[in-house]
Each structure stands twice: as C-alpha cells, then as structure tokens.
UniProtKB/Swiss-Prot annotation:
Biased composition range(s): Basic and acidic residues: 279-291, 426-436
Species for this entry: Homo sapiens
Protein's recorded name: SH2 domain-containing protein 7
Source lineage: Eukaryota, Metazoa, Chordata, Craniata, Vertebrata
SMART domains, per database record: SH2
Gene3D superfamilies: SH2 domain (3.30.505.10)
Amino acid sequence: MEDSLKQLSLGRDPEGAGDSQALAELQELALKWFMETQAPFILQNGALPPWFHGFITRKQTEQLLRDKALGSFLIRLSDRATGYILSYRGSDRCRHFVINQLRNRRYIISGDTQSHSTLAELVHHYQEAQLEPFKEMLTAACPRPEDNDLYDAITRGLHQTIVDPENPPATAFLTVVPDKAASPRSSPKPQVSFLHAQKSLDVSPRNLSQEESMEAPIRVSPLPEKSSSLLEESFGGPSDIIYADLRRMNQARLGLGTEGSGRHGPVPAGSQAYSPGREAQRRLSDGEQNRPDGLGPVLSGVSPDQGPTESPTSWGCSDAMGSLGATWRQEFPKLSQEAQPCSQGSSADIYEFIGTEGLLQEARDTPDQEGSTYEQIPACWGGPARAPHPGASPTYSPWVHGYKRISGTPELSEPGNTYEQIPATKSKETGRTHKPDKLRRLFFTYRKHKF
C-alpha cells in the first residue's frame, strides 16, 4: 500500500519541479505529511478513492476536466503547500478550492463555514449542496487515467508473442485492452508496431488457416526500376524520331571515323553531330542576321583566316509533326580562283541561297538512309570542292538547297566585312552641316521655346 501511494504521488511531478530544489523539498514534506497523517483516513478497503489524483498540477487538472460533464471533480495534493485542492468543472471554466485541515482534524473548504470529518464526507456533502457563490454542485468523480495498466498489458502481449510462438499472434492485440476501465481522457499511447506483428506472423504461420495466412501478410508492390537511358524508354510517340536520327548519325560517324580521318584529315570540332532541329534554327538565324539588305544569306561559321569552323553542308532538321527525320543538304560549286580566304587581304565571297530540283530528285533516289548527315569541307576555299564520302549519303529532304556565286559583286576592303565602305572625302563636303553643331543648336532652341 505504501509503495502504491508513493508511486501515485511521485509519479506525476509538477512541471519544472525537478529544476527547483525548493519545490522538491516541499513535495517531500507534503508526501511525508500525507503518508503519516492522511493515508489511513483516505484509503477505502485498502485502495485509493477514484477522485484522489495525488500530485498533479493545475494545468494537468484542467486538461483532464476540459471535456468532462458539468460538475465532474477530483481532489489533488497541492504542489505549493501541505494540503488538498478541490477542482471541478464549472459552467464556464474549471474552479479550484483549497481544503484546509483544522486543529481538530476536520476538513473545511476555504471561505465556507461548515466542516467535515473526512474528505469522503466533504465530497458527499457538496454533491447534495451547492457551492457558493456559483450555485454549482459536484456530480461525478473524474477517474485517474490507467496509464500503468495499459503499458503493462502491451508489454505482456509483446513478450508472449515473441517468447511463445505456439499461440496465435492475435493475442498480442487482445491483451492491449486493460482489465480495468480506463478513463476516456487517458492520453493516447503507441500501439503494437507493424514490425512486431509481421514478425509474429512469420514465426507461427502453422497455426493459421490457409485463408488467414494469405490475408495476414501485407505485401507492397516493388517500385519500378529506373531506366538507364532516357532516350530509349522515355519517348514512344512520333517525336522520338529526332532521337532515333541522332543515334543513327552518331553510329555512322563512329563507324566511318577512322576511314574519313585518313582521307580528309581531322574533322573540325564544330562539325560534330548536334541536335537536328535546334542547331538548324540557330544556324539559319545567324545567317540571316549577318547578311546585308538585298543579298542572300552569308555563309555562317566561316573564318577568313582559318577556313570553315563548322560544317554548313548538312543541317539536321526534323519535322515537328512526327514525320521522318530529314536533313538539309547544301552543295557548293567550284569557287572562283580569286576568292581564297586563306590568303591575307582577300575579300569574302557572298553566295545566294537557291533551290535545286535536281538535288532533290537525287536525294530521294538515294537508297542508303543510314549514312552520315554531314559532309567534309575543304580546308581552303581555293582548292576544289571534294565530294562527300562514298559511304556517307544524306537522307532525303523536301527542300535541298545549294549556293552559287553572284557575279558582279564588288570586292570589299576587309575579308569579314559585308558592308560597302564610304570614302573619307565625302564627309568633308562644304555644304554639309557638322552634326554636333546642328544638334547643339536644336537643343538650345528647344529649351528656349520650353521656358
């Protein structure tokens, strides 16, 4: 009995009591006072009454009585002094009254005039009489939460499941229910984890019927394995033609790399395979931005000193609606002996973008569709244009274009400059007004009229 009283009183220390030495000493004195003078009078048939909760704080008391019916009450030990406190659920909030013990060992509520011989008699009195000045009465005792019983039941159930595999695992869940009726306000506690239940199902499968053994284990479908290549599985519609053409071009370029390098020399870094649609749009836009008005597109990617840096003969292009992947093929006729960008001071040549029906028919009749989509460019514009590799035949395209030189184009002073140079003598005409002076006069005239 003494051990149960100590567990009840010291098991619920007030919040922050462990940090304060004074509160700890006060609780020790209150516990000694309760054990020596109060316990024999409170015990009913060797057990504590359901309305006595021992050491609990005001905050914990209000949490217990928050959702209880009007008039639900409990008696607790004060955590600030040696005495009792009556707490009950009022009409608008929880109310707390101090219970004092007189010299004649009788109990009285502070502020009241009627005393009682025991706490049980005091509780019975206020269940029939009203508490002044609130005109409220006590109804039912708020039971203590049976936390220890619940934990003991869970522990016994787990121990029985692991140690005695002969018993069915359902006993672990049946023993969770405590023997005594637990309080509705008992705090939720962790139940038996799924891991222990799964282990118990695996240990004793012979005690279950065939249907139960099939329903008991819950199996989760494995996650799908991720693909190592996005280009192989991610695209299954018509739009994957772009990637198929790109892989075919890479295979053809790798297969013919050794023979092509022996005949034509090292291929420039810019002539490698690119994304067909994006690279074609970039190159066409660059060519249109660099050309002057009235002239065809200037050959992009050509350096006057180093020759071609990228291969402009084949620009990959894919139809956006899912049609067959096609490339653009451009043909260069033999260049004039005068236009040699490899020599210093020579003028850049300008070409016109024209369509050739013969090339279209020739490309459509070409049987080989697995070849490379790029052609080798001669290292110097002055040399004869080499034919593409025999094994490399471009795929057909609805539009196949070439370039031809425009006759009568005046040579420019600089190789990379496509604009006409204006002689310096024209800027020194006598009848022309100097631009800074003209702007200065207009500015002062504007300010004069404004103010």
